[in-house]
Amino acid sequence: MTRPIWMGDEPPPDRPPTLAGRGRLALRGGAMALVLMAGLTLHLAVRLIERPLHGGHRPWTPAITPVVCRICVAILGLRYSVRGRPMQHIGAVVANHTGWLDIFTLNACQRLYFVSKDEVADWPFIGWLARATGTVFIRRDPREAKAQQALLEDRIRDGHHLLFFPEGTSTDGLQVLPFKTTLFAAFYTHGLDKVMQIQPVTVNYTAPEGEDPRFYGWWRDMPFATHLAKVLSVARQGAAEVVFHPPLDVSDFPSRKDLAAACEAAVRSGMGQRSR
């Protein structure tokens, strides 16, 4: 897998799973794979009926993903909590990005559609899963900028809560990188700023007892398979907390840079403030 890389500090050294760890890896990994495949099969079956009747509106299939992700979080054994409430208004969500685990922790508590770099569509299994669940893929090509802008606008007006990671990469989970403002421009076209809100969200992870505080972070050139195996094989998981901040009216901010700065400040304010 290739992805924009944040270098940060040197990651903790990899440790091969113990014999017991391999057993946990097999049990958790196998169970999660079965749940994901069952959820994807159900999603595709429902979509076959939903698409002819509703087109891009997707009134039924978004309810499947949170259930699947909640089951996966439970299988993983991650202690999971939520503060605040997901917004109901038309709009988008922005969050800090720690790694692949965000897919489960963020989807488990609300109906979302991820906005991702186009190369993710080619990743084994994950790309297939992302396409099936309505992920919006963005290509770094100026010639396609207008078409992609129109796609984002259409999805938002259809009531889809699109999830952006404005840091542009994943981190060690202990900090928030400066937000890139480019994608915020999508919220200022064709009067969209007059009708939509942005909800900043902070995802906090607590490492398992005795592990490096950056345990759940995925950065530098860490291999996906190695990191996945490390998380699945640990004896006792840590915790994840999703913090929903008050939604922001886009119309209150004169420019994308002002809006991005306000969202970044909100996300930063929730870092490390885990409830007990």
Swiss-Prot record:
Subcellular location as annotated: Membrane
A Pfam family recorded for this sequence: Acyltransferase
Membrane spanning residue stretches: 25-47
Catalytic activity: a lyso-ornithine lipid + a fatty acyl-[ACP] = an N(2)-[(3R)-3-(acyloxy)acyl]-L-ornithine lipid + holo-[ACP]; a fatty acyl-[ACP] + a 1-acyl-sn-glycero-3-phosphate = a 1,2-diacyl-sn-glycero-3-phosphate + holo-[ACP]
InterPro entries per UniProt: Plipid/glycerol_acylTrfase
Gene Ontology cellular component annotations, sorted alphabetically: membrane
GO BP annotation list: phosphatidic acid biosynthetic process
Phenotypic effect of disruption: Mutant lacking this gene is unable to produce ornithine lipids.
Alphabetical keyword list: Acyltransferase, Lipid biosynthesis, Lipid metabolism, Membrane, Phospholipid biosynthesis, Phospholipid metabolism, Transferase, Transmembrane, Transmembrane helix
Molecular function via GO: 1-acylglycerol-3-phosphate O-acyltransferase activity
EC numbers, comma separated: 2.3.1.270, 2.3.1.n4
Domain of life where this protein originates: Bacteria
Statement: the UniProt record of this protein carries the keyword Metal-binding: no
Pathway membership, UniProt: Lipid metabolism; Phospholipid metabolism
Membrane topology reported for the UniProt record: Single-pass membrane protein
Biological role stated in the UniProt entry: Catalyzes the second step in the formation of ornithine lipids, which are phosphorus-free membrane lipids. Uses acyl-acyl carrier protein (acyl-AcpP) as an acyl donor and converts lyso-ornithine lipid (LOL) into ornithine lipid (OL). It can also act as an alternate acyl-sn-glycerol-3-phosphate acyltransferase (AGPAT) to ensure glycerophospholipid production.
Family: Belongs to the 1-acyl-sn-glycerol-3-phosphate acyltransferase family. OlsA subfamily.
Name of the protein this chain belongs to: Lyso-ornithine lipid O-acyltransferase
Originating organism: Rhodobacter capsulatus (strain ATCC BAA-309 / NBRC 16581 / SB1003)
Lineage: Bacteria, Pseudomonadati, Pseudomonadota, Alphaproteobacteria, Rhodobacterales
